[in-house]
Amino acid sequence: MNFQSKTINASGNAKTVKGDGEYLTAVMYLAPYKLSGEGNLCPMAELAACHKGCLNTAGRGKFDKIQEARIRKSRWFLRDQQSFMEQLDKDIDRFRTKCFDNGVKPVVRLNGTSDIRWENFQVPDGAANFFEEYPDVQFYDYTKIPNRKVKGIKNYSLVWSYSAANKKYMDYVSAAKSAGMNIAVVFRDENFPRKFLNYPVINGDKDDLRFLDPKNVVVGLKAKGAAKKDKSGFVVDI
């Protein structure tokens, strides 16, 4: 089942989870870091050194027309946030309705290639954020931003994104782990280790349903796009 809109898109088959029905994920892809030329949508990118090996160039992201579309969308968000939020609200609502009409559970990932604190963005109709507006939609993201105010938001799951670029960022990794967050790690080789950071490693490339992962695990992801050549510490060699 496919879903296309101006902000979020879903393609491919819904993922079947035994005993829990089917899920379909819609993702919003913006231009990460400073690629839009008008703002920084990944505030921790330089500290974590992930801007050069960003997964933005993986898959269809390698095509110029895809990058141009992400830049246009990002500039829209940065220049006219009100109209962008109104459109995003409409698109989430349409996606939600289509999923329910087809007996599928809707999942939305707003930070496909960005790291924005969506918990701080009020929805045009007055809701505190999209998570409050759509309690029957499951949201999730990866993040490198510490101390995000998401405690108590039951339908928003965050996974911490690892980098060993420097000690300061590693301190944030340790804090995230102590806070009980799962840790996503990009490995250069697809043969993931059994354990990393004293956590068992699961294969995060098998599906995108991070909110269903067990607690206290490392989510292994294979390096894609520009990340294949990364030497900053963002991508891990075993």
Over which residues does each language-model region extend?
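Class I S-adenosyl-L-methionine
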Residues: 1-238
